[in-house]
Each structure stands twice: as structure tokens, then as C-alpha cells.
């Protein structure tokens, strides 16, 4: 039996929830399920916006047939060619022989790649700003390349002032009968999953998201209809603001996220001691065991927190495997502008700190707070002062107001250590400053042009 929800008088949600899928895209755990959203506009013409993943095809087809109520389907608008939204295209053409497909030029190429040449005669490529009048409604197409594939576009309904936003503004989690974000406590129940969705699916493409947000500013939007998660009809500024923050890589919390990877518990102990000292100083701390918690959750909180600490055992003269994979994941998502500290452990030749720094230091705007803390097998009582100093340094850095860490013109400068390459960012370089990595004094720093 059908299971649809009305978005408004002319739009109907005809998508489906899936709770059987363990890993979205084969990578990201979705313990609370996920929705595959598809929307039908019934006007003088009928328009379907995207299809769904083949995992929920039966529910989708029943929903679509019910919403059409015997009418023909005139158009399918393809916003995004990923198979979780386009898997049913070929069957739609078989079921509705009059239907025409509208998509971007690059999506048209991808349709051929996924389904062969048979659909070519049904496809019209549309460009930025082109419109389709369906009767009462005028649809305007908006290019959104690399959010998060190159062929992506969105559709703005000028009549109902709603934006069908493809994969932007989505969320992990099944809808559970709800459709609108205002039907539940979104902050409490879904904000973390919305952040995890953004950071892992779209997070790499911050500049492209910023470009879409600038386009959105020119539109009078009263409703957001994404391809995953809830429809937004209230508090749009709140959620658009979150996307603005995330896509600028601005942290939401001034605090410390600590991720560690430990073989026998000694590296974990060092991380716990540091967390305790930081908490005693009033610093907000979040901890993860990289060998237990899937990377997508840690990546999400790396976007959330201003300061990051990574602690790892040396393993086969490298970084312990789960930490190495986590850091590669963070680097792949191009998280920017973070302050970090490292703890390394090794019984005879600890090198994990150097190896971790080699992965993190090239990232845009990343800078080390302090030289790596080295543990030889286990943290010793005579290292208490080192832990305390590291905690003091991190706490002081967290307490800085980033808005005031500028020169008299409100600008930040980058000062590079000529000895080791460490980068200090701020308004001016203090005269008594010493490089946290090599100990070189301020005279060994040069300002980047």
C-alpha cells in the first residue's frame, strides 16, 4: 500500500525510508536508516523530481502510482545521477512511455553511461536559468556543480518559492512517518546526523557549497526539499546558517576533540590523562577511540570542534592503522583551519607523531599547537609536567578569541619557521615567541607574502 505525504497543495513526497541498509554508499553507517526522497508536482503537467535507490523501488512505484491517480507522467527532472536517486530511470521510461527527462548536459552523458543509448531520445539538457512552465508553476533550473558531483543541478519553483536542492541540506536517518523538520526536535535528534551527512558526503566541497549559498541568497526561498532527510518549511535561516558555517570550515564549538588509536591501552591512557587535565581547566572535550568508532562520526566532530588532538601508537614504523585511515579520511575531506596537537607512542622508535604531522601540516590553515608529546611504551609519572604543559598550552589556545587574533586592520598574517616550516597565524608574531616544533626563536620566522 502507498505511503505518501503532502508537501503542499501541488507537491507530494513519493519517496521511501530504508532501514535495511547497513552502510550508505558502502561506507557510512546508518543505524537509524535513511530516506530516499522523490517529489511529484501535479499541475497541468506532471513532474517527478528524481527517483530512488533500487532498494526501495517497490514502495516508490506504489507511491508514485497513487499520487499520479491515473495521470500520465510528463517529465522527470534529474538533479543528480548517483544511483540512489536515478536507479529507476529506465523503468520509469518503460512505465510512462510519454515521459521526457530534463537534466544538465553532464547528467545526460551520465544517463548514457549508466543505462546505455536507449534513453537518449527522451533527454533534454537544460542550462542555468532556463525555465519550464507546467501550468500554474514556473520551474527555474539552478546549476550546482560539485555539490557533490559535477552534473548536479537544483530546481527553484518560482510559484511556491521552494528549492529542490538535490543532495544539499540532507540528513542521515529515516523519516519515520514525519516529513518536516519542525515535526520533531531537530537539534536534539537529528543535528548530529545532519552534520555527519554534510561533512562526509559534501564536506570536501566547501567552496562549491558557498557558491550555491550565494545563489540561494538571490532567491526567495520558503521551503527546502532535499533528496535525503527532512523538508524545511520553518527556520530556514537556521539550517542555511549551519551550511554556511560548515562550508567555511568554521568550528561550532571552541573545545577539543581527542581521537586515539591504542593497541594495549597505554596510548589510550595518555589521551585520557590529557582529557582530564583539559576538563579541569574548563575546556570542552570529546573523545573517540578510532579503533571502535567509525571514521564518519569522528570526521563530523572534527568539523565541529576548533582544536583537535590525535594520539597514536607507532605500528610497523608508521601510524597505527585505524588512526592512519582516520587522518587520510580527514585530509580527503579537506577540512581547513584547525589547530592540533599530537601524542605518539613507541617502545623502541616512536615515529607516529612525525608521520601524523606529515599528513596534517599540509592541510590548509592547519597549525600545530605544540611539539608532539612522546610516550615510550607507557606514560611515566615524571612526564606529568609535560602533560600539564600541553594541557595549559591547548587550554590557552582554545581560550583565544579568534575574532581578536588579528592586526589593527583586522587581518591575520602567516609567519613561517625557517628551520622546520611550522606556520604561526595571527595579527603579529610575539617577540618572545618560540616555535612549538623545533624551539627556534622569533628571529627565525619570516612572514609569508
Where are these regions (language model features)?
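FMN-binding flavodoxin-like domain, especially the glycine-rich phosphate-binding loop
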Residues: 175, 186-224, 228-231, 273-288, ...
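Cys/His-enriched microdomains
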Residues: 265, 413-415, 433
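Short, non-ligating residues that shape and space the ligands of small metal-coordination modules
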Residues: 426-427, 443-447
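Short linker/helix segments within small regulatory modules
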Residues: 426-434
Amino acid at each position: 500500500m502507498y505511503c505518501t505525504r503532502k508537501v503542499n497543495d501541488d507537491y507530494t513526497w513519493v519517496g521511501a525510508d530504508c532501514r535495511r541498509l547497513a552502510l550508505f554508499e558502502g561506507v557510512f553507517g546508518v543505524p537509524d536508516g535513511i530516506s530516499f526522497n522523490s517529489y511529484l508536482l501535479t499541475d497541468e503537467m506532471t513532474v517527478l523530481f528524481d527517483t530512488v535507490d533500487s532498494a526501495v523501488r517497490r514502495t516508490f512505484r506504489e507511491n508514485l502510482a497513487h499520487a499520479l491517480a491515473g495521470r500520465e507522467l510528463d517529465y522527470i527532472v534529474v538533479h543528480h545521477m548517483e544511483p540512489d536517486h536515478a536507479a529507476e530511470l529506465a523503468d520509469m521510461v518503460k512505465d510512462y512511455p510519454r515521459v521526457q527527462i530534463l537534466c544538465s548536459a553532464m547528467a545526460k552523458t551520465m544517463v548514457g553511461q549508466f543505462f546505455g543509448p536507449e534513453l537518449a531520445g527522451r533527454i533534454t539538457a537544460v542550462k542555468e536559468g532556463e525555465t519550464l512552465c507546467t501550468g500554474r508553476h514556473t520551474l527555474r533550473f539552478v546549476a550546482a556543480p560539485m555539490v557533490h558531483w559535477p552534473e548536479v543541478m537544483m530546481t527553484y519553483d518560482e510559484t511556491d518559492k521552494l528549492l529542490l536542492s538535490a543532495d544539499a541540506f540532507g540528513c542521515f536517518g529515516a523519516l519515520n512517518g514525519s516529513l518536516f523538520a519542525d515535526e520533531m526536535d531537530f537539534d536534539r535528534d537529528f543535528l548530529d546526523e545532519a552534520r555527519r551527512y554534510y561533512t562526509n558526503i559534501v564536506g570536501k566541497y566547501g567552496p562549491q557549497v558557498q557558491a550555491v549559498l550565494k545563489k540561494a541568497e538571490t532567491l526567495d526561498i520558503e521551503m527546502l526539499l532535499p533528496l535525503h532527510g527532512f523538508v524545511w518549511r520553518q527556520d530556514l535561516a537556521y539550517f542555511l546558517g549551519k551550511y554556511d558555517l560548515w562550508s567555511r570550515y568554521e568550528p561550532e564549538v571552541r573545545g577539543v576533540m581527542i581521537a586515539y588509536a591504542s593497541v594495549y591501552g597505554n596510548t589510550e591512557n595518555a589521551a585520557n590523562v590529557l582529557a582530564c587535565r583539559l576538563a579541569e581547566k574548563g575546556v570542552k572535550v570529546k573523545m573517540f577511540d578510532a579503533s571502535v568508532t567509525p571514521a564518519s562520526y569522528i570526521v563530523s566532530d572534527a568539523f565541529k570542534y576548533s582544536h583537535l588532538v590525535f594520539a597514536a601508537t607507532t605500528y610497523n614504523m608508521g601510524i597505527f592503522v585505524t588512526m592512519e585511515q582516520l587522518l587520510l579520511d580527514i585530509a580527503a575531506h579537506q577540512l581547513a583551519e584547525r589547530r592540533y596537537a599530537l601524542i605518539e607512542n613507541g617502545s623502541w622508535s616512536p615515529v607516529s607523531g612525525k608521520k601524523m604531522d606529515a599528513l596534517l601540516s599540509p592541510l590548509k590553515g592547519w597549525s600545530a599547537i605544540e611539539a608532539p608529546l612522546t610516550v615510550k611504551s607507557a606514560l611515566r609519572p615524571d612526564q606529568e609536567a609535560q602533560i600539564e604543559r600541553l594541557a595549559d598550552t591547548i587550554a590557552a589556545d582554545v581560550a583565544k578569541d579568534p575574532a581578536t587574533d588579528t592586526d589593527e586592520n583586522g587581518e591575520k598574517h602567516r609567519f613561517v619557521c625557517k628551520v622546520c616550516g611550522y606556520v604561526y597565524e595571527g595579527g603579529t608574531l610575539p617577540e618572545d615567541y618560540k616555535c612549538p616544533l623545533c624551539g627556534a626563536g622569533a628571529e627565525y620566522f619570516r612572514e609569508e607574502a
